UniProtKB/Swiss-Prot annotation:
The active site is at D67. SMART domains: Lactamase_B. The gene is rnz. The keyword Transferase does not apply. Its EC number is 3.1.26.11. This is Ribonuclease Z. Its cofactor is Zn(2+).
């Protein structure tokens, strides 16, 4: 599991940062990629990565401001040209369906794959299968804005091979049966339960990806115990008034959310063009006393999300 940042800027593109988009790379977990937001030129940023558009199976839109959605029509069309024929689902606030369908209709674009929309009207679970659960919560922005919590299901425990050997169980196909938790009859007549030879499950990982927002309790709820929290930091430490007036957050407010939520790491994005180079990095330095594991991300950064140590 990795996060690859395709755009980390705020409002409009700059020479250093494109507008909002990131990819949650789930190639090992489900041979797929999930996009979160799709600002202008997202597909151009993808050209600088190993991402294949046909691997994108879901797109989660946080809100309908242009810097988060203007890249959608182009990306969806290019996915058709590049061999994408599997269904794609777009999640987002009410209005996302009208936006996409209008753009495709006016441009007379035809997609080679089924396109499904899930429009959000409130807080709750928006997707669940055997491997992942995605929950959305409303944030505090000028228009409807959501954050997403992606929870991975626990992985089965490993077969404790040494314990199996000590029990005198011969190697071979029996090991596979035990690993599946089956009750097995051994050649010597003994009956053993596979569950007795399997270690504790490995807890799944949790990623919280927030849209534009002011300070809100829902941000803390989304980030509770997260391995990684992606939070906007449009404004610096001492600009609380500006942040409030423009419905955004400061770096300090983002760090406070991470601390309250008990998150493991904080990745600051949605960085204003006023902060360039070391001035952008200072957004992280100024909050290390609040939340040490803080980093300002840049376009095309790839962040590994390992399992927690047992």
């Amino acid at each position: 599991m990795q996060i690859e940042f395709l755009g980390t800027g705020a409002g409009s593109p700059s020479k250093q940062r494109n507008v909002s988009s990131l990819a949650l790379r789930l190639l090992e977990e489900r041979n797929a990629i999930w996009l979160f937001d799709c600002g202008e030129a997202t597909q151009h940023q993808i050209l600088h990565t190993t991402i294949r558009p046909r691997k994108v199976e879901k797109i989660f839109i946080t809100h309908l401001h242009g810097d988060h959605i203007f890249g959608l029509p182009g990306f969806l069309s290019s996915r058709s040209f590049q061999g994408g024929d599997e269904p794609l689902t777009i999640y987002g606030p009410k209005g996302i369906k009208d936006f996409v369908q209008t753009a495709l209709k006016v441009s007379e674009s035809r997609l080679s794959y089924p396109l499904k929309f899930v429009e959000l009207t409130g807080d709750g679970e928006v997707f669940k299968d055997q491997t992942f659960t995605v929950t959305a919560r409303r944030l505090d922005h000028k228009i409807a804005s959501f954050g997403y919590r992606v929870e991975e299901a626990a992985h089965p425990g490993e077969l404790m091979v040494e314990k199996v050997r000590q029990a005198g169980i011969p190697s071979g196909p029996l090991y596979g049966q035990l690993k599946r938790g089956e009750v097995v009859t051994l050649p010597d007549g003994r009956t053993v339960d596979g569950h007795d030879f399997i270690g504790a499950p490995q807890p799944g990982r949790i990623v919280a990806i927030l849209g534009d927002t002011r300070v809100t309790d829902n941000a803390v709820k989304l980030a509770k115990g997260a391995d990684v929290l992606v939070h906007e930091a449009t404004f610096a430490k001492n600009e609380q008034r500006l942040a409030h007036n423009y419905y955004h957050s400061t770096s300090v407010q983002a760090a406070t959310v991470a601390k309250k939520a008990g998150a493991q790491r904080l990745l600051l994005n949605h960085i204003s063009a006023r902060y360039v180079g070391r001035y952008a990095n200072e957004l992280a330095y100024q909050v290390r006393d609040i939340f040490e594991q803080t980093r300002v991300v840049n376009d095309l950064d790839v962040i590994e999300i390992p399992f927690k140590e047992r």
